[in-house]
Curated annotation (Swiss-Prot):
Pfam families noted in UniProt: PEPcase
Keywords (A to Z) from UniProt: Carbon dioxide fixation, Lyase, Magnesium
Function recorded in the entry: Forms oxaloacetate, a four-carbon dicarboxylic acid source for the tricarboxylic acid cycle.
One GO BP annotation of this record: oxaloacetate metabolic process
Listed PROSITE patterns: PEPCASE_1, PEPCASE_2
GO MF annotation: an example: magnesium ion binding
Record-given protein name: Phosphoenolpyruvate carboxylase
Listed NCBIfam families: PRK00009.1
Length: 878
C-alpha cells in the first residue's frame, strides 16, 4: 500500500514545491512563509494537537485583507494539483486503474469458474449497451482554461515516469511543469461571467474532442483484445456498445435560458463539430490509404478502372462531402439562409458506407492489418458519435405541457384541461392522438410560455432523425404527462417516434411509478406506438432531498424492481435511465458498486446514466482515464447481467421498509418540520453566497422566494459539503439503522451487509461521507456564523452524526471508517491538511462579508476561491 502511494505522494510533494516557488517569485518570501506556517499547523492539528488547532484558527482569523486572497489561492491551487496527481496516479503504471482492462480478463475467468458458457458470455457482450448522458450541472467549478493546464500537467507527470530519460529531457519536462504551475497561479480561477447554455455545450464538445475521440476507440481495442484472449471472440466492426448523449442545450427544466432557439443552435453546432473532427480523421486516411489493389465492388464505387488509388479517391469524396456539409452548417450558424448542398450529411449511414466498403475490400485483398488501423477507429467513431457527434435529450417539466394543452382547450372552447380528471385527460389525449386532423389552429396566438413549448417540439420535428435521443419529463406523476408530450410532438409534425421518458423523482412519485406505467401499457394505442421499448428515468437527487438518502435509495430500488417485473410480464424491453449526481446525496457512487447494487435484471435493457459536472472530468478528462472508466462500466454491466445479485429475502425487505420509514421521519422532522431549520441552514452554510458564483447557466432556485423545497438539489448538497456537515448524504440513515437494531435486527443487518450488494453499497457510501464530514469544522462554522439561539440545533445534528458513525461501524464490523478502501482513506487524509485551512478561512470570510454594509471586493474574491478550493478538496460539489 505505502509503496503504491509513494509515487503519488512524491508527485504531490514535487508539485507543491513548484507552487511554493511560484508564490515566492510572485509575492515574496513572507507570503510563502505564511502559507507554510498554516500548512504545518493544519498538519499538526489533524494529528490531534489541540494547541496547533487553536493557533491555526487565530492565524487565519488575523490575516490582513492583503493576505486573504494569496492564502486562499495557495491552498485551492494545491488541491487542484493534488487532484491532477491523483488522476494521473489512477492511470499510471503504479496505480490501481492501470489494470482495469485486465480486470475484464479476470471477470471472464471468474465467469468461467461459475460454469457460464462462452456462448452466454458472447451473447452478453453482443447485448452490451452503455449510454452516458453528459449534463451541464453547475458542479464543474474549475474553469476550462485551468483544466487545459492541468491536463498538460498530467502529460508531464506521465513523461517523467519514463525510466530512460536523459538529464536534458528531464530538465525540459521540469521546466514545462514550472511554466504550467506559474500559468495557473497567474490565471483567475473563478469565472467572471456565468456560462451561457451554448458555452456549456461547447464545454461538452471539448470533452469529446480532447478525450473521448481518442479514448473510445482505444477502449474498444483493449476490450476486443480481452475478448479474443478470453473467449476467442472478436467484437464485430459495427458493434460499438457506447453512446454519448448530452443535456447541454436541451435541458430546459427550470432553466429559462435554454430556449427552442438555443436547442436549434446547439444541434447545428454539434453537427459542425462532428464534421470538423471527422475531417481530421479522413485527412489521415487520404494520406494512408494509397493502396491500389481492391475488390471490383470498391473499384466501381470509386469511379471505375481509370482510378489508380481507389481507397484514396473514396476518402477524397468523403472529404468533399464533409467540407460541403461544414460550410452549410457554418452559414446556418451565422443566421444565413442557404440551400443545403446535394450531398449534405444527415445520417450516419452516409459516412459509414464508403468507409466500410474500404474496410471490407482491404480485408478481402489480404490487407487486414491496414483495415484494422486508423480506418477501424474511424468506423467505430461513426458508430459511437456519428453525424450528430452527441445526441441531445430535451427535458421539460410536466406542468409546462399541461399548461400548454389547457391554454389550447380553453381557446377551442373545450373547457379547462387542467381541471379535468386524470381519466378524462387520458381519454381526450388518446382521442386526439388517433385523430387525423390537427388540433392546433393555424391562426392561434398562444402565450409566450406555450409558444416556447410548441416551438421546442418543432425543433425536434425538424432535427435529423437520430440527433435527438429522448424527451424527458421531469416531475412526471400521471400517465397523461407522457401522453401529453406525444400529442405535442404529433402536432409539431414529428416524423419519427421519439422515446418519451417520465422522470419519477419524489418519494411519492417513485412509489407510484409502477402504477403509472401499468396504466400506460394498458392503452392499446400506446403499446402500438412504443414497439416493445420503454425508457423510464429514476431521479436520485430530488428524491434524496425530499425524503433523505436512505428512504430515497430504497424507494428507487423498489420502483425499479416493480417496473422491471411489470415490463417483463408485458414483453417490453425496459431501459432504466439513472439520474445520478456526483455526490452521495444525489445518488453518486463508485460505478462498479452502484451497478452491482441495482435490482436483478435492471441492466438487461442496457445502462443509461447521467454523468455530471466535475465527475465528467474525473472519469473522462483524459483518454487513458476514459479507457479505465469504460472498462469499469463494461465489466460491471456484464457481471450484473451474467451473475445477477440475489433477490432480497422477505426479511430483508421488511427490515428495509422499517428503517426506510424511520429514516424518512427523522430527516423530515428536521428539514420540513423544524421551524428553525431553514434559518440555521442559511446561516451555517454559504448557501446565499453560492448564488454569486457564476457556475452554470441554470438558476439555483426554481422560485426565488422559496425555502429548501424550492432549492435545486445541487446547491442544497453543495452548501452542506462546504461546511463539512455533509448533512443531505446521511441525515436519517443512522437513525433508521438504529431503529432496526432496537427492533432486534442486528444479526439480520449484518447478513444483509455481507450478502446483499444493495445494502453493503449503502453502508459503504455512508462510510465515505462520514470520512469526509468533520465535526469540529462544522462546529466552528456555527460559532462564527450562527446566532446563539440556533446553536442547540447545530449541536443536535452533530450529535446525530457522531451517533450514526458508531452505528455504521458496528454494522460493518469495523473499528475505523473506510477500513476496506484504504486508498480512499489515504486520499481524504492527504487532502484534509489543505482543505481544513480553506474551511476555517471560508468561515472567517463569511463572517466578515456578512458584517459589512458594502461588499469588499477582496473578501468576496477570496470567499469564492475558498468555495472552489473546498469543492476540489471534497472531490465533488453537488
Amino acid at each position: 500500500m505505502n509503496e503504491q502511494y509513494s509515487a503519488m505522494r512524491s508527485n504531490v510533494s514535487m508539485l507543491g514545491t513548484l507552487l511554493g516557488d511560484t508564490i515566492k517569485e510572485a509575492l515574496g518570501e513572507h507570503i510563502l512563509d505564511r502559507v507554510e506556517t498554516i500548512r504545518k499547523l493544519s498538519k499538526s492539528s489533524r494529528a490531534g494537537n489541540e494547541a496547533s488547532r487553536q493557533e491555526l484558527l487565530t492565524t487565519l482569523q488575523n490575516l490582513s485583507n492583503d493576505e486573504l486572497l494569496p492564502v486562499a489561492r495557495a491552498f485551492s491551487q494545491f488541491l487542484n494539483l493534488t487532484n491532477t496527481a491523483e488522476q494521473y496516479h489512477s492511470i499510471s503504471p503504479h496505480g490501481e486503474a492501470a489494470s482495469n482492462p485486465e480486470a475484464l480478463a479476470q471477470l471472464f475467468t471468474r465467469l468461467k469458474d461459475k460454469k457460464l458458457s462462452d456462448q452466454d458470455m458472447r451473447s452478453a457482450v453482443d447485448d452490451l449497451s452503455i449510454e452516458l448522458v453528459l449534463t451541464a450541472h453547475p458542479t464543474e467549478i474549475t474553469r476550462r482554461t485551468l483544466i487545459h493546464k492541468l491536463v498538460e500537467v498530467n502529460t508531464c507527470l506521465s513523461q517523467l515516469d519514463h525510466n530512460d530519460l536523459a538529464d536534458y529531457e528531464r530538465n525540459k519536462i521540469m521546466r514545462r511543469l514550472r511554466q504550467l504551475v506559474a500559468q495557473s497561479w497567474h490565471t483567475d480561477e473563478i469565472r467572471k461571467l456565468r456560462p451561457s447554455p451554448v458555452d456549456e455545450a461547447k464545454w461538452g464538445f471539448a470533452v469529446v474532442e480532447n478525450s473521448l475521440w481518442e479514448g473510445v476507440p482505444a477502449f474498444l481495442r483493449e476490450f476486443n483484445e480481452q475478448l479474443e484472449n478470453s473467449l476467442d471472440y472478436r467484437l464485430p466492426v459495427e458493434a460499438v456498445p457506447i453512446r454519448f448523449t448530452s443535456w447541454m442545450g436541451g435541458d430546459r427544466d427550470g432553466n429559462p435560458n435554454v430556449t427552442a432557439e438555443i436547442t436549434r443552435h446547439v444541434l447545428l453546432l454539434s453537427r459542425w463539430k462532428a464534421t470538423d473532427l471527422f475531417l481530421r480523421d479522413i485527412q489521415v486516411l487520404v494520406s494512408e490509404l494509397s493502396m491500389s489493389e481492391c475488390t471490383p465492388e470498391l473499384r466501381e464505387l470509386a469511379g471505375g478502372e481509370e482510378v489508380l488509388e481507389p481507397y484514396r479517391q473514396l476518402m477524397k469524396n468523403v472529404r468533399t462531402q464533409l467540407t460541403n456539409t461544414q460550410a452549410y452548417l457554418e452559414a446556418r450558424l451565422k443566421g444565413e439562409r442557404v440551400l443545403p448542398p446535394h450531398d449534405l450529411l444527415v445520417s450516419n449511414d452516409q459516412l459509414w458506407e464508403p468507409l466500410y466498403a474500404c474496410y471490407q475490400s482491404l480485408k478481402a485483398c489480404g490487407m487486414e492489418i491496414i483495415a484494422n488501423g486508423q480506418l477501424l477507429d474511424t468506423l467505430r467513431r461513426v458508430r459511437c458519435f456519428g453525424v450528430p457527434l452527441v445526441r441531445i435529450d430535451v427535458r421539460q417539466e410536466s406542468t409546462r405541457h399541461t399548461d400548454a394543452i389547457a391554454e389550447l382547450t380553453r381557446y377551442l372552447g373545450l373547457g379547462d384541461y387542467e381541471s379535468w380528471s386524470e381519466s378524462d385527460k387520458q381519454a381526450f389525449l388518446v382521442r386526439e392522438l388517433n385523430s387525423k386532423r390537427p388540433l392546433v389552429p393555424l391562426k392561434w396566438e398562444p402565450s409566450a410560455e406555450t409558444q416556447e413549448v410548441l416551438e421546442t417540439c418543432r425543433v425536434i420535428a425538424e432535427a435529423p432523425q437520430g440527433s435527438i435521443a429522448a424527451y424527458v419529463i421531469s416531475m412526471a406523476k400521471v400517465p397523461s404527462d407522457v401522453l401529453a408530450v406525444h400529442l405535442l410532438l404529433k402536432e409539431a409534425g414529428c416524423p419519427f417516434t421519439l422515446p418519451v421518458a417520465p422522470l419519477f423523482e419524489t418519494l411519492d412519485d417513485l412509489n407510484n411509478a409502477d402504477d403509472v406505467m401499468t396504466q400506460l401499457l394498458g392503452i392499446d394505442w400506446y403499446r402500438g406506438l412504443i414497439q416493445g421499448k420503454q425508457m423510464v428515468m429514476i431521479g436520485y437527487s430530488d428524491s434524496a432531498k425530499d425524503a433523505g438518502v436512505m428512504a430515497a435509495s430504497w424507494a428507487q430500488y423498489r420502483a425499479q424492481d416493480a417496473l422491471i417485473k411489470t415490463c417483463e410480464k408485458a414483453g417490453i424491453t425496459l431501459t432504466l435511465f439513472h439520474g445520478r449526481g456526483g455526490s452521495i446525496g444525489r445518488g453518486g457512487a463508485p460505478a462498479h458498486a452502484a451497478l452491482l447494487s441495482q435490482p436483478p435484471g435492471s441492466l438487461k435493457g442496457g445502462l443509461r446514466v447521467t454523468e455530471q459536472g466535475e465527475m465528467i472530468r474525473f472519469k473522462f478528462g483524459l483518454p487513458e482515464v476514459t479507457i479505465s472508466s469504460l472498462a469499469l462500466y463494461a465489466g460491471a454491466i456484464l457481471e450484473a447481467n451474467l451473475l445477477p445479485p440475489p433477490e432480497p429475502k422477505k426479511e430483508w425487505i421488511e427490515v428495509m421498509d422499517l428503517l426506510s420509514d424511520a429514516s424518512c421521519d427523522m430527516y423530515r422532522s428536521y428539514v420540513r418540520e423544524n421551524p428553525e431549520f431553514v434559518r440555521y441552514f442559511r446561516a451555517a452554510t454559504p448557501e446565499l453566497e453560492l448564488g454569486k458564483l457564476p457556475l452554470g447557466s441554470r438558476p439555483a432556485k426554481r422560485r426565488p422566494d422559496g425555502g429548501v423545497e424550492s432549492l435545486r438539489a445541487i446547491p442544497w448538497i453543495f452548501a452542506w459539503t462546504q461546511n463539512r456537515l455533509m448533512l443531505p448524504a446521511w441525515l436519517g440513515a443512522g437513525a433508521g439503522l438504529q431503529r432496526a437494531i432496537d427492533a432486534g435486527k442486528r444479526d439480520v443487518l449484518a447478513t444483509m451487509c455481507r450478502d446483499w450488494p444493495f445494502f453493503s453499497t449503502r453502508i459503504g457510501m455512508l462510510e465515505m461521507v462520514f470520512a469526509k464530514a468533520d465535526l469540529w469544522l462544522a462546529e466552528y462554522y456555527d460559532q462564527r456564523l450562527v446566532d446563539k439561539s440556533l446553536w442547540p440545533l447545530g449541536q443536535q445534528l452533530r450529535d446525530q452524526l457522531a451517533a450514526d458513525i458508531k452505528v455504521v461501524l458496528a454494522i460493518a464490523n469495523d473499528d475505523h471508517l473506510m477500513a476496506d478502501l484504504p486508498w480512499i482513506a489515504e486520499s481524504i487524509a492527504l487532502r484534509n491538511v489543505y482543505t481544513d485551512p480553506l474551511n476555517v478561512l471560508q468561515a472567517e470570510l463569511l463572517h466578515r462579508s456578512r458584517q459589512q454594509e458594502h461588499p469588499d471586493a477582496c473578501v468576496e474574491q477570496a470567499l469564492m476561491v475558498t468555495i472552489a478550493g473546498v469543492a476540489a478538496g471534497m472531490r465533488n460539489t453537488g
